[in-house]
């Protein structure tokens, strides 16, 4: 950038303090320069996103990242003591001790991983699994030492394989891990159409399933997997990024495998590129963002195999990750999808879920020529939406 990035509202405070009577909601946002900006910059900012806070839309802390890191996602481990930052540009993980953020950081090399995407953690806090879209494999790590301890390779079978993995989700009770086949990072026109099931305890690839009713190659690009709460038998939602559809995967106890069905199509809604999903606390609402033209969708899933679209709330181009406030009042939607044209707005839309409308905008990064790639609440405000 031409000008030094200004830190707004810098204050000496402990970021892990509990919620007080003062309005405040601190979130981590990893950011990068918008395309065309000189002197490319990356970093992670702590921003107050609570519209009722006196520090709303101000950066509280800021820490730099290498300008070619291309930080993508931020994940907490099971007890939110550590934040894992994945990289599209480096074969590394940056891991932050959240009690000392950003001063305590560990850089973990993952040399066999190209284009690191999503992470899922085992319930016993012993392992993590990193999807690597560029190398078509999964890295297994020790969640205590954070050192890589294994690799799940792409597989040799034409009907059981890992290819361009992005979304990854472990169901500990079933000992099953889902991995999507999304898109070749070197060629966005080369998209997958499947999900693969892995036995987590043995790291064995069990099966691969096509999620499309179209002839192959359909290029549907399944992107994320989300197990619905309190379902018996267990079931998950999967969204197809290019296909614009939602599918379900339902556990079949007798055969110990999954059945797959399409349950919603975004065709006719004026939206495309469904990305992130999440649930409300009761588990009767499913939230789905769509990147183009940018919206936050609310589904009634009281009948989980017949999701009903209740509301579509326009946000801005590139609607992607989101955070729900601890009181369930607000959704905070990060509007940028890997800095793509028309999907790189750079703002965060604050949605009042009692009114289903945008009531405020966090644009401190956007005004600085930056765009966020992910948002996650700081540990004191964090709640799991999946």
Task: Describe the predicted segments one by one.
Residues 16-18:
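N-terminal signal peptide c-region/cleavage motif recognized by signal peptidases
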Residues 13, 22-386:
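Predominantly soluble domains enriched in secretory-pathway, periplasmic, or organellar proteins
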Residues 8, 21-22:
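A generic structural signal for short, non-catalytic loop/turn and secondary-structure boundary residues
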């Amino acid at each position: 950038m031409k000008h030094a990035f200004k830190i707004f509202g810098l204050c000496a405070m402990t970021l892990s303090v509990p919620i007080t009577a003062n309005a405040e909601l601190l979130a981590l946002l990893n950011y990068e320069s918008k395309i065309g900006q000189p002197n490319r910059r990356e970093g992670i900012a702590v921003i107050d996103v609570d519209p009722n806070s006196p520090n709303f839309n101000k950066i509280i802390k800021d820490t730099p990242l290498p300008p070619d890191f291309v930080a993508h996602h931020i994940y907490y481990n099971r007890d939110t003591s550590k934040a894992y930052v994945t990289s599209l540009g480096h074969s590394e993980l940056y891991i932050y001790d959240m009690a000392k953020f950003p001063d305590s950081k560990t850089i973990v090399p993952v040399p066999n991983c190209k284009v690191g995407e999503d992470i899922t953690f085992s319930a016993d806090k012993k392992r993590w699994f990193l999807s690597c879209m560029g190398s078509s494999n999964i890295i297994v790590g020790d969640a205590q030492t954070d050192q890589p301890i294994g690799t799940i390779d792409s597989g040799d079978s034409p009907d059981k394989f890992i290819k361009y993995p992005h979304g990854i989700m472990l169901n500990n009770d079933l000992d099953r891990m889902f991995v999507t086949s999304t898109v070749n990072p070197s060629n966005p026109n080369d998209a997958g159409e499947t999900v693969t099931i892995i036995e987590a305890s043995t790291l064995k690839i069990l099966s691969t399933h096509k999620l499309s009713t179209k002839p192959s190659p359909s290029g549907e690009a399944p992107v994320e997997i989300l197990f619905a709460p309190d379902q018996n038998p267990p079931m998950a939602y999967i969204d197809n990024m290019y296909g614009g559809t939602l599918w379900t995967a339902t556990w079949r106890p007798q055969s110990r495998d999954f059945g797959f069905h399409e349950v919603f199509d975004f065709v006719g809604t004026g939206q495309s590129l469904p990305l992130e999903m999440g649930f409300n606390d009761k588990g009767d609402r499913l939230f789905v963002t769509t990147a183009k033209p940018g919206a936050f969708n609310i589904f009634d899933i009281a009948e989980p195999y017949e999701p009903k679209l209740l509301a579509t709330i326009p946000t801005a181009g590139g609607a992607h990750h989101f955070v729900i406030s601890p009181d369930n009042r607000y959704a905070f939607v990060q509007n940028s999808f890997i800095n793509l044209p028309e999907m790189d707005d750079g703002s965060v839309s604050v949605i009042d879920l009692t009114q289903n409308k945008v009531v405020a905008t966090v644009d401190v990064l956007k005004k600085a020529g930056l765009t966020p790639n992910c948002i996650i609440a700081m540990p004191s405000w964090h709640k799991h939406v999946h």
